[in-house]
Amino acid sequence: LEHGVNVMLEKPFTVTLDEAVAVMKAEKKSGKILTIGFQPRMSENMQMIKKIVESGELGDIYYLQAGGGRRHGIPSPFGTSFIEKETGGVGAVGDIGSYSLDMLLNAVGYPKPLTVSGYTSSFFGTDPAYYPKHPEYAEKFGVDDFAAGFVRLEGDIILDFRISWAMNMDTAGDALILGTKGG
């Protein structure tokens, strides 16, 4: 941006709020385009969902559900850089949750959040038994392995969110978009 070119960043966009503010200021100052590389946003299915929402076929959107995760899927086979706060920084929310959130919010035009309530935990990541070959990884685990959130959005829309790297089931739920005429 500072060199006068458009920029595409891979997720995570940034790790801290301060970094995000600095990048957004740089974009505004440069007059160039900044986009984040969320590949699912550009998929044929997501483009179709966005068109359906925009057409009004679903009516007024009032509820979004974003869920997903992995059964025992903390990314650690290649060392600890992904699970340490200093090097990975984002945990399950930033790794896989960001895709779920982006897909739904993109489909409904990114309404402004009004209130946010959230919870994160690291029940599995900090348990040495989770890493039978490398129990020392548990000591280095510094990010979330589960998160849940509830966001009240502009337009009287509710977003219910849950994501996990490590759970004892296959999914934390599907993506849902509910409107007054369909869903």
Predicted region positions:
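Beta-strand-loop-alpha-helix segment that lines the small-molecule cofactor/substrate pocket
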Residues: 1-41, 56
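Residues that form or flank phosphate/diphosphate-binding pockets in enzymes
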Residues: 18, 44, 170-172
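Structured helix-beta-strand junction loops
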Residues: 3, 29-30, 88, 155, ...
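Non-transmembrane alpha-helical segments in soluble domains
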Residues: 1, 24, 50, 101-105, ...
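NAD(P)-dinucleotide binding in Rossmann-like oxidoreductases
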Residues: 127, 138-147, 152-183
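Predominantly a Rossmann-like dinucleotide-binding segment in NAD(P)-dependent oxidoreductases
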Residues: 40-141
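Structural detector of well-ordered beta-strand residues that form the stable sheet scaffold
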Residues: 8, 33-35, 65, 117, ...
